[in-house]
Structures are given as C-alpha cells and as structure tokens.
C-alpha cells in the first residue's frame, strides 16, 4: 500500500539501461520520499503514553515545535517557521477534559501545558486525551492522543501537606521544571523530609483572586501544595504562633525565620499558608449496616375502584360565573341611572339662573365672538411701534412710515443686512417741515 502510494507521486525513478532492475533516483526525490515516509510513520505513532501517580502533580507540555512538522506544506530541513498555534484538549468522547486536569496557554506563540493532580478513582483506567492543534495562519489541524495511565501511590503516602501562596509567579511560570525544582529544593531545605512531592498547583484566579493590572512586575499568584512523609518543621509551625496570627489579622507581614531561604526567588504570603496533618484527621465514614432487603409489611394493598362517581360541576360553574356577572350588572344599572336619569337639562338650568347673570354671561359670549371675528381680518394697519426707526443702510433716524406706501415683504430680516442690488428700496414719507429727532 505504501509502495503504491509512492509510485502515485509521479515516477521518481528512472531506468539506467545498464542492468535489469537498476533504478536511479535524484537526491531531491530521495529527500522528499524519506520525509513523506517519516511523516506517515509519525502520524501512525502519534499516540503517547504517560504514567503519572495518583495524588502527585502531573505536568505535560504541548510543544509547538513538535506540532509544526504536522502541518502541510511540511517544512524542509533547516527551515524555521513561527506560525501561531493553539491547542484544544478534551477527553475522548466528551467535550471537555476530566475535572482534575487543567490546561493553559497564554498566547498562540507559547507552548500549552496540561497539569493537574490525578485522583485515586481513575487508577488503572486509561484516560485518553485528544489534543487538536490549530495552525492559525494556514488553518490546518493536527490531532494526537495522549494516553494517561494513572498509577497507584498508596505504598508511598504523604500524610503531611502544606500549601504555599507565591505572589510573584504565574501558573505557567511555576509549571516550568526548573522553577518548580528550585521551589521544591527550598522547601526541602526548610522541611528536611525524606520524600517530598508537589501535589497540586492552582492559579489564584481559580480561587477567586483578582486579575492583576497590566504592569510589568504584577503577577496573578499561584498556590502550590506539597506533601512530605515527616512532620512539619518548627519554621513552618511559626505561622501558627499567636503573635503571627495577630499580625496577619492586622494585614501585617508575619515574622518567619526561614523566609530568607525563599525570598531570593519566591515571595511567599505566609498568612495564606495551610498546614494539613492527615494523621490527626478523624474519619467521618460510617459503616453501612445492610439489612435483609425485605420491606416491612404494610398490609394488603387496596387499589382504587374502577367505577368512580362522576362529579357534578354545574353548581361550581354558576358560583364562578353567575355571581360576578350579577354584581357587574347591578353596578352597570346604577351607573346608567346616575349618568342618564339624573341630568337637569339646559332649560331647567336657565330657569333657575337669575336674569342678570344670564345677561352678563351673554355679553361675555358676544365679546368673545367679536374678538374672534376681528382676529380673522388681516388688513388692519400695523401699529407704529412695530415699524423700523433707523435706516437699514445709513443708520439715521427716520420718521414713522405708513403701511400703504411700501411693501413689507422686501424688508431685511436684520437691521444690519445691506440692501442688495435687486432689492426694492423702502420709500420714506416726506415731511413738510423741519423734523427734530
């Protein structure tokens, strides 16, 4: 099948004629053939198996460089590409990951990280994670499977657990093997255990923390839980002192003697440290006492009769509809009597009104009618107070003008508006004598 596909590429070989069955292949064709075969075998063996332990931190890095060779056109040897790549991870057959597994990738130009603490419920069950890589430039996709085989860690218990809050780290920075190794080394120097493992790492944002300001040195913060097989050291116990508890309640930094061993690289908030001793925890599990599985005798079951009496709803219908309808009808009749039968009428009102009041009212109506008739006549001369006093061009004082010798439609809208050439001049009234302003 592979040979057939190889020949479909287009006769990369040529007969030399020097011997039967002798083939000649160019170097470029040879390189293309080997790269194609390598790509096919890499896709066949793309599944990866990992074996984390239950209750111990699991970290798997999705490297962009590993997936770059999966997107066509396949890069040539020595060729460097920096395409943006994002990842989507989910449990096979489900839309999301298991509850204990988290994923983070800051930018399409950084590697993705799967991390979490496997639970004991999944021990012995392979967990298949589908990893889909997206090339944001070419829109090509590549899919790999990550098979997580969770191992049991009951033979190496870690009953003493401590959770630290590191203020100057982000979760992806803390997941780096070098940084996590430095932190575990500092904790081991303070705690002095025989075995020390990281149990879980959680971002402060997942605990309700605030998103930091976009400043260079501002970090989200991260919670790191570690477990050991020996009791807590005296330095870690200093947080439980009443003096340090009082300082923490006053939002002051407690005095810890071993803080200088972390301060060079990690800024720890000692007020948020949590110490858990599982050897002193009282088990709340109650053994279930199983009975015989027989229900107590409740007597003979009596089902309802098949012939049920039909219920008459006629009375309920009358009470529900007839009573409100009767009340509404009575109210309607009362309202009709008040509005129709209790009216006095105009004649009765005039008979009860004195004559002098009727005359006064009639005169008011007559005056109102005359004013309305006068307002309809628009041919009345303008009052002198509304005529212009100053000449619109020269600004000189002019005598009042009558409305019968000029056209009011050609008057300028503003007194400062100059007369245009096509505008008709307003005639002025000639005075017979000398006029004083």
UniProtKB/Swiss-Prot annotation:
Residue positions the entry lists as glycosylated: 200
Entry's localization field: Cell membrane, Sarcolemma; Cytoplasm, Cytoskeleton; Cell projection, Dendrite; Golgi apparatus
Expression by tissue: In both neural tissues including cerebellar cortex, striatum, cerebral cortex, thalamus and hippocampus, and non-neural tissues including quadriceps muscle, liver, kidney, spleen, lung, testis and heart. Widely distributed in the brain, with a robust signal obtained from regions with dense neuronal packing such as the pyramidal cell layer of the hippocampus, cerebellar molecular layer, and cerebral cortex. Levels are highest in kidney, moderate in brain and lung, and low in skeletal muscle, liver, spleen and testis.
Keyword Acyltransferase: no
Entry GO CC: cytoskeleton; dendrite membrane; dystrophin-associated glycoprotein complex; Golgi apparatus; plasma membrane; sarcoglycan complex; sarcolemma
Keywords: Cell membrane, Cell projection, Cytoplasm, Cytoskeleton, Glycoprotein, Golgi apparatus, Membrane, Transmembrane, Transmembrane helix, Ubl conjugation
Entry's Gene Ontology BP terms: kidney development; skeletal muscle tissue development
PANTHER family in alphabetical order: ALPHA-/EPSILON-SARCOGLYCAN FAMILY MEMBER, EPSILON-SARCOGLYCAN
Family that this chain belongs to: Belongs to the sarcoglycan alpha/epsilon family.
Protein name: Epsilon-sarcoglycan
Native species: Rattus norvegicus (Rat)
Gene transcribed to yield this protein: Sgce
């Amino acid at each position: 099948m592979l040979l057939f596909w190889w020949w479909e590429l287009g006769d990369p070989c040529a007969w030399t004629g020097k011997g039967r069955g002798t083939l000649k292949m160019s170097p470029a064709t040879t390189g293309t053939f080997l790269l194609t075969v390598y790509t096919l075998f890499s896709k066949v063996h793309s599944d990866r198996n990992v074996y984390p332990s239950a209750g111990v931190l699991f970290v798997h890095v999705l490297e962009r460089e590993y997936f770059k060779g999966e997107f066509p056109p396949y890069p040539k040897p020595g060729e460097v590409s920096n395409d943006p790549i994002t990842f989507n991870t989910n449990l096979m057959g489900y839309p999301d990951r298991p509850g204990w597994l988290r994923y983070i990738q800051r930018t399409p130009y950084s590697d993705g990280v799967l991390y979490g603490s496997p639970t004991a419920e999944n021990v012995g069950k392979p967990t298949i994670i589908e990893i889909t890589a997206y090339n944001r430039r070419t829109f090509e996709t590549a899919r790999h499977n990550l098979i997580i085989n969770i191992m049991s860690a009951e033979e190496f218990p870690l009953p003493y657990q401590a959770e630290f809050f590191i203020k100057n780290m982000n979760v992806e920075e803390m997941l780096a093997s070098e940084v996590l190794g430095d932190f575990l080394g500092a904790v081991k120097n303070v705690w002095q255990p025989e075995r020390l493992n990281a149990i879980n790492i959680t971002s402060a944002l997942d605990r309700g923390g605030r998103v930091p300001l976009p400043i260079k040195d501002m970090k989200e913060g991260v919670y790191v839980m570690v477990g050991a097989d020996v009791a807590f050291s005296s330095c870690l116990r200093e947080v439980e002192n009443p003096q340090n508890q009082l300082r923490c309640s006053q939002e002051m930094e407690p005095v810890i003697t071993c803080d200088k061993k972390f301060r060079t690289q990690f800024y720890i908030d000692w007020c948020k440290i949590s110490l858990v001793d599982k050897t002193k925890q009282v088990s709340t599990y109650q053994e279930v006492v199983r009975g015989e599985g027989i229900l107590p005798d409740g007597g003979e079951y009596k089902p309802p009769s098949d012939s049920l009496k039909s219920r008459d709803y006629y009375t309920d219908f009358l009470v529900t509809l007839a009573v409100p309808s009767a009340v509404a009808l009575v109210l309607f009749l009362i309202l009709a009597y008040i509005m129709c039968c209790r009216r006095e009428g105009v004649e009765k009102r005039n008979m009860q009104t004195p004559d002098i009041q009727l005359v006064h009212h009639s005169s008011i109506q007559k005056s109102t009618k005359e004013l309305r008739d006068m307002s309809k006549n628009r041919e009345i001369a303008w009052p002198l107070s509304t005529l212009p006093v100053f000449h619109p061009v020269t600004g000189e004082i002019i005598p009042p003008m009558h409305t019968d010798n000029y056209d009011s439609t050609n008057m300028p809208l503003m007194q400062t508006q100059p007369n245009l050439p096509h505008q008709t001049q307003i005639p002025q009234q000639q005075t017979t004598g000398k006029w004083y302003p």
